[in-house]
Structure formats: structure tokens, C-alpha cells
Design a protein with these regions (language model features):
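Alpha-helical transmembrane segments and their immediate juxtamembrane cytosolic regions
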Residues: 1-357
Length: 357
């Protein structure tokens, strides 16, 4: 029997994935979004955590749903590297270095593809177009470690509650992750994983403590309060989990919790609106293709912009976007959501057709 999905959690995922694409699109409020949007996904995963079926079953599931997409997507981008060079999606033109944050790409050989795929298998590096998958790597590492620690604690404590020892362990890892960030150490993404373990833990705590039945006016008040807190905190510090950067451990925890409240109340407040609820839930069930494909999808907007303005072809390789200001972020966001959804729909249709035969 299929597991019943929580529509509020799906909507929260949907809001989170929209925020992620917005944060990469040149949206003016990107710094605000970065305060909490990636922490949200770790907390959602913690909320859904269950060792039902045992640790081996859990690990196998994470290998299929996280590790395999990471390896396959990065390998696909590597295989397509030379084609992307011909199409200017990537470029070897050194003029691209004049665009901040960009790098020159060189052609790859079959040997390169094999060698890099081995690296992807152990989360050593990644591709430019697959840059957002740092999160998939970190979530895999955190999920597996949390499950193993939980299993060991259950054995040691003979079935007693593991919440307190897990909390103490997550606190130690948070401190270590913060120190790693200050030192610039992040081998295999382990610094990020150490920092984010506590966010996964927070999700498990919230699952136990969250009240479901709250009057609408109280939800509105909580939403407004969380928004105000984040606005204030945004003036006091910053969060950049992709680089394991945050002002302090306490700052990370407070912004993450405020972001959770903001997004959860938004999901609950929009639940009575069928169109919004269905759209957010649909997005929430398609987070992986959006994470993998939204940077590539941005290229369509840049290409159309260059056709209109007569820009140099090599500028198509500008990453993640080239055009900024005005309403360009709207176009990039639309492409970053719609095109991956379309690709996912085609993939599912082909998959179902093949399975049917």
C-alpha cells in the first residue's frame, strides 16, 4: 500500500524549490531567501525520517533516491560537455572570465568521463550545471549518518528515547561544522554535512512538537512574526550553506527555525486555495528534476536575450545567469521551474510506456 503523502509537507517542498530557483535567478531578495531556504529541506527530511524497515532498508532507499541521481546527473553533464561547448552552453573562450564567477571549460575525453564519474561516486566535486546538487550530496551524508547514529543509540539505550543524545551529538557536529567553515575545510562536503546535521535533527524535533490545529489568525500572526524576524536577522548576518558559511551556530539555528515557521504557515494558509495547493504540491513532488535541470533551463532565457540584444554567443555560457535587473529574474524563474517539470513529465511518460510493454 502506498504511503499517504502529507499535503502540507508537499506544499512546503514546493515553496522551498521555488525559493531555490528564485535565489539563483537574480531575484533582488536573494540574501533573504538564503537565510533559510536550504535549511528548510534538511528540516523537512528530518521531519519525514523513519527507520521503519531497519537501517539497511533506509540506506538502500537513500542510495536510489539521492546518490544515484547525483552520480547519473553529473555523469550526463560530463558526457554532454563537448556538445555543450559547441552550443556555447559552456565555453573555452577566455573572455568569459571577465564575467564575475565564471570559468573556462575544456573538452573532455572518454578517459576524463570515466575518471570523473569515479569522483562523482564518492562525492568528490561536481559539474557546473549540476552545481545545485551540493545539497543532494550533503543530504545523503547527513541522512545516512543520522540513521546510523539513531540505530546505535537505540541499541545502546535499549529502546529509550534518543532525542537528547541525538541533540547533543548534533550540537557537537554544528560546532565542528562552523569551525570547518571558518578554516575553509570542506573535503568531500563533510564540513557542510556537519553543519547541517543539526537541521535534520530539528526536523525530527518539530515532527514531535508541532501543533496541527491552529486558528487561521494565529497562523497569520506567526507568518508575519517569522517574516519580521528574518528581515531583522538579514541585517545582522548571512547564511550560505553551499559554502558552509554562516554568521554563527546560533544565527543558523534561529534563521532556520524562523524560515520553517514562515514556510509552514504559508503552506497552511494557502491550503484552502485548491489551485495554489495543487501547484505547490506538484512542485514539491518534482524537486529532484528541478534541482538537476534548472541551471541548464536558464540557458534558454539567456539565449533569447542574446538574440534580442545581439550579444556575443560565448556569453550564453555565463553562469548561472547573464541578464540581471528589471524582470529578468521572473523569466529565469519561470524557465527554471517549467522546463524541468516538462522534462520530468516526458520522462515519466516514456518510463510508463516502457514498463507497460
Amino acid at each position: 500500500m502506498a504511503k499517504q503523502r502529507d499535503p502540507v509537507i508537499d506544499s512546503m517542498r514546493g515553496i522551498g524549490i521555488v525559493l531555490m530557483v528564485l535565489g539563483h535567478s537574480g531575484f533582488p531578495g536573494t540574501d533573504f531567501i538564503y537565510l533559510f531556504h536550504m535549511a528548510l529541506f534538511f528540516m523537512l527530511s528530518g521531519w519525514l525520517f523513519s527507520l521503519r524497515g531497519g537501517p539497511l532498508h533506509f540506506i538502500k532507499r537513500k542510495v536510489v533516491t539521492l546518490w544515484l541521481p547525483f552520480v547519473l546527473a553529473n555523469t550526463a553533464f560530463t558526457v554532454l560537455n563537448n556538445l555543450f561547448l559547441k552550443l556555447n552552453i559552456l565555453t573555452s573562450d577566455e573572455r568569459i572570465l571577465q564575467v564575475p564567477g565564471n570559468a573556462v571549460t575544456t573538452p573532455v575525453t572518454v578517459k576524463d568521463v570515466i575518471g570523473r564519474t569515479v569522483h562523482w561516486c564518492v562525492f568528490d566535486g561536481g559539474t557546473q550545471l549540476g552545481g545545485a546538487m551540493w545539497f543532494i550530496q550533503a543530504l545523503f551524508q547527513v541522512s545516512i549518518l543520522y540513521a546510523l547514529v539513531e540505530f546505535i543509540l537505540q541499541r545502546l539505550l535499549h529502546g529509550a528515547d534518543t532525542l537528547l543524545p541525538q541533540g547533543l551529538f548534533s550540537g557537537v557536529l554544528l560546532w565542528l561544522g562552523w569551525r570547518c567553515g571558518l578554516a575553509g575545510w570542506n573535503v568531500w562536503g563533510l564540513g557542510i554535512a556537519a553543519s547541517c546535521y543539526c537541521l535534520f535533527y530539528l526536523g525530527t524535533v518539530l515532527r514531535r512538537t508541532t501543533r496541527e490545529s491552529i486558528p487561521t489568525y494565529q497562523r497569520g500572526t506567526l507568518f508575519a512574526a517569522a517574516f519580521a524576524v528574518l528581515l531583522i536577522l538579514g541585517r545582522l548576518g548571512s547564511v550560505g550553506l553551499a559554502g558552509n558559511g554562516y554568521s554563527s551556530p546560533i544565527f543558523l539555528l534561529v534563521t532556520s527555525l524562523a524560515g520553517w515557521v514562515l514556510v509552514r504557515e504559508a503552506a497552511c494558509l494557502t491550503a484552502p486555495l485548491p489551485c495554489v495547493r495543487v501547484a505547490l504540491a506538484y512542485l514539491g513532488r518534482a524537486t529532484m528534476p528541478i534541482v538537476i535541470l534548472h541551471f541548464l533551463s536558464f540557458k534558454l532565457v539567456t539565449w533569447l536575450g542574446l538574440l534580442t540584444t545581439g550579444g556575443e554567443p560565448y556569453l550564453l555560457a555565463a553562469f548561472p545567469i547573464y541578464f540581471t535587473g528589471g524582470a529578468w529574474w521572473l523569466a529565469y524563474t519561470a524557465a527554471g521551474l517549467v522546463l524541468p517539470l516538462a522534462a520530468n513529465a516526458v520522462y515519466k511518460k516514456i518510463k510508463n510506456t516502457v514498463l507497460a510493454h
